[in-house]
Amino acid sequence: MGTDAWDGKQAAPPRRARRWLRWLMAAPLLFAAASVLQVLILRVVDPPISSMMAGRYLEAWGEGDWSFSLHRQWRDYDKIAASLPISVVAAEDQQFPMHHGFDLQAIEKARDHNARGGRVRGASTISQQVAKNVFLWQGRSWVRKGLEAWYTVLIELFWPKQRILEMYLNVAEFGDGVYGAQAAAQQFWSKDAAGLSPSESARLAAVLPSPRRYDARRPGAFVQRRAGWIQRQARQLGGPAYLQAP
């Protein structure tokens, strides 16, 4: 009897180990299923807040600013001036209509540029930025980069290009705490996003790399130069019709 009791005690740890092993094996599958469901839902449902917006709240509260609030208001793609999407694409990701989430040529150029030293250049596509802004957190860890790649693949697989761009135009930060085209148009020019001029659209696109540093409403020399370049690039691409290309 003593031997049987001892055998039972010895058998318990292996059973627990197998149970934990099963959970560890199931966890990636559960995450994959949950993330696919997330992406499918957001194909048709407009998110009330993105992970980056939530991060701004946490950042402000961590600094003791409990009165902090964001400016945001969703606008459907067809309710945004046609000059803004093409300005953003001209500024951020000119291969957007053609690539499947990753611009390998831009990545190679950025790597070569960064290897030579100087100012670090990124190569994130609009799809990658949507994956980061909607689903993930700030940071440069390999885990976050891996998740960004995973979500990029999913949104390219399950969302049409127009939905990806619509999401970007509604969650991108265009000023300190100002998220989305509608909030930017109202805060900066007291108008609706549908009424943005090509010049205003180019200025909004120009501040995207550092929206808390640059001001689209009162642009400095850098933003003015970049906005002019963006307008020229948008014209060379063919204007808004470029985004209708198959």
From Swiss-Prot:
GO terms for biological process: cell wall organization; peptidoglycan biosynthetic process; regulation of cell shape. The chain crosses the membrane at residues 20-42. One of its GO terms (molecular function) is pentosyltransferase activity. GO terms for cellular component: peptidoglycan-based cell wall; plasma membrane. Pathway: Cell wall biogenesis; peptidoglycan biosynthesis. Disulfide bonds: none annotated. It comes from the Bacteria. It is a single-pass membrane protein. It catalyses: [GlcNAc-(1->4)-Mur2Ac(oyl-L-Ala-gamma-D-Glu-L-Lys-D-Ala-D-Ala)](n)-di-trans,octa-cis-undecaprenyl diphosphate + beta-D-GlcNAc-(1->4)-Mur2Ac(oyl-L-Ala-gamma-D-Glu-L-Lys-D-Ala-D-Ala)-di-trans,octa-cis-undecaprenyl diphosphate = [GlcNAc-(1->4)-Mur2Ac(oyl-L-Ala-gamma-D-Glu-L-Lys-D-Ala-D-Ala)](n+1)-di-trans,octa-cis-undecaprenyl diphosphate + di-trans,octa-cis-undecaprenyl diphosphate + H(+). Keywords: Cell inner membrane, Cell membrane, Cell shape, Cell wall biogenesis/degradation, Glycosyltransferase, Membrane, Peptidoglycan synthesis, Transferase, Transmembrane, Transmembrane helix. Its EC number is 2.4.99.28. Pfam families: Transgly. Its main location: membrane. Peptidoglycan polymerase that catalyzes glycan chain elongation from lipid-linked precursors. HAMAP family: PGT_MtgA. Belongs to the glycosyltransferase 51 family. PANTHER family: BIOSYNTHETIC PEPTIDOGLYCAN TRANSGLYCOSYLASE, MONOFUNCTIONAL BIOSYNTHETIC PEPTIDOGLYCAN TRANSGLYCOSYLASE. This is Biosynthetic peptidoglycan transglycosylase. The gene is mtgA.
